[in-house]
Amino acid sequence: MRLSKYYLPTLKEKPAHAKIISHQYSLRAGLIKQIASGIYTWLPLGLLVLKNIEDIIRDEMNKSGAIEALMPCVQPASLWRESGRYDDYGKEMLRIKDRHEEDMLFGPTHEEIATDLIRDVVKSYKDLPLCLYQIQWKFRDEVRPRYGVMRGREFLMKDAYSFDVDYEGALNSYNLMYKTYIKIFKRMGFTPIGVGADTGPIGGNLSHEFHILANTGESTLYYDNKFSELLESEDIESLKSIYAVADDMHDPETCPISQEQLNVSKGIEIGHIFYFGDKYSKPMKASVTSQDGKNVNIHMGSYGIGVSRLVGAIIEAFHDDKGIIWPEEVAPFRIGLINLQTKVTEAADKIYKALKSDEVLYDDTEGSVGVKFSRMDLIGLPWQIIVGKKAVSENIVEVKNRATGEVKEMQIEEAINHFSAK
C-alpha cells in the first residue's frame, strides 16, 4: 500500500484526555477516532490490526472444533425475561423499544440468544458436545468509559458457548477452551495468566479470567512463580490448580504458598471463561434425552475474549517512547518501506513491486526525513526498509528491526529475498 494513497491521520501531540499509553498511541498512530464517549470509529490501520487478531482467534477456535455463527446485536427483551436476567442486569444494558413498543436491547452478551439457538434443535445426547462462537459487536453503557478501547461502551468480542449432556462433558469443554485461550494469547506474544475469578452477572460456579502482565493494568495478580514453567507445558489441570488469583480473590492470611514463592504483578484482563451448568438451560427449557433415556438440562459454558480491548492490551505490552511495537502476527503491515529522497524512487519502487503489497506500507510521500522516521516508529511496523542514497551508489538499503532498534545494511536483492522467503 502506498502511503500517498492511504488514509493515515496521525497526530504529533499527545491528546490531553488520553491518560494511558495505549489510548495515546491508538489516537496518535491513526488507529481510531473518538465519536462519542466510549465509542470509536476504527480507521484503516486499526481495522487491519483488528482483522489480524480475529484471524488468530478464528484459527485456534476452529482447530478446537468450535463452529462459527453470527448472532444479532439487537435482542428481544423477552428472552432475557425468560432467563430471569432482564431486571437484574442493571443500567449497563442499553434498553430500547421498536416501533411496535416491544422491549428490545443492544446485547451486552449472548447467553440467552445462544440457548434459544439450539433448544428447539438439539434434543439428544448424540447431538452433543457442541460449541458455537461468534465475533460480534456488543454494547455496555459503562458509567465512566475510559482508557480508549480498553474500557469502551461499544466493543468487539469473541464469545463462544458450549453445550454438553453432563458435568463431565462440560468440564472437558471448559478445559479445551482454557487450552485454546492459552494458544491464542501466546500467538500474540503474551504470557497469559489464568486466575480464578468471580462469575459476576454471567453466573455459575467455575470461572477463570485471563490477564496479561502490564504496569498499567487495573488488576493486581498474585500467582505461583511456577506458573510460567507450567504455561510452556500447557498442562491445563496443573495450571488451573496452581495458585493464581486477582486482588479481589486474594487473602494473605489463607494464601497457600509462601511469600518467596508468590509473584505480584499488575495485569490487564483480556478474556474470561465460565461454566454455569443449567443456569440458562433450565429456565429456558433447553434439554436433551440422555443415554439412559432421562430428560436432562443441557450443561453450558461461555467463553469471551475482548477483541478490540486486545488492541489496547497489545500496545500496553509492546511499546517504547517512540510508539507502538507490533508483534508480527498482529501488525497491520509487516514492513514499512521508506523512500528518503526523490533520486532513489526507482530503487524503492523496485523493492515495493517485488514484495507483497498487502504486507508493505510504502512511504512515498514528500515529507521530511524526520517526519517519515517518526511516523514509521509511531505506527510500529515490525520491519523498516530504508532506501537512501546508498541505494543508487552501492545498491544498499538499511533494514531496521523496530523491536530491537538494530539496523543492518543489505544489498537490495538480499533484502527482497530475505522478506520474500518469510
UniProtKB/Swiss-Prot annotation:
EC top class named in words: ligase
Gene Ontology CC terms, in alphabetical order: cytosol
PROSITE patterns: AA_TRNA_LIGASE_II
Catalytically driven reaction(s): tRNA(Pro) + L-proline + ATP = L-prolyl-tRNA(Pro) + AMP + diphosphate
One GO-annotated biological process of the protein: prolyl-tRNA aminoacylation
Subcellular localization: Cytoplasm
Stored CDD domains: ProRS_anticodon_short (cd00861), ProRS_core_prok (cd00779)
One of the record's GO molecular function terms: ATP binding
Disulfide bonds: none
EC number: 6.1.1.15
Record carries keyword ATP-binding: yes
Keyword Protein biosynthesis attached: yes
InterPro entries: aa-tRNA-synt_IIb, aa-tRNA-synth_II, aa-tRNA-synth_II/BPL/LPL, Anticodon-bd, Anticodon-bd_dom_sf, Pro-tRNA-ligase_IIa, Pro-tRNA-synth_IIa_bac-type, Pro-tRNA_synthetase
Keywords attached to this entry: Aminoacyl-tRNA synthetase, ATP-binding, Cytoplasm, Ligase, Nucleotide-binding, Protein biosynthesis
Function comment: Catalyzes the attachment of proline to tRNA(Pro) in a two-step reaction: proline is first activated by ATP to form Pro-AMP and then transferred to the acceptor end of tRNA(Pro).
Similarity section: Belongs to the class-II aminoacyl-tRNA synthetase family. ProS type 2 subfamily.
Oligomer and partners: Homodimer.
Annotated protein name in UniProt: Proline--tRNA ligase
Taxonomic lineage from the root: Bacteria, Pseudomonadati, Pseudomonadota, Alphaproteobacteria, Rickettsiales
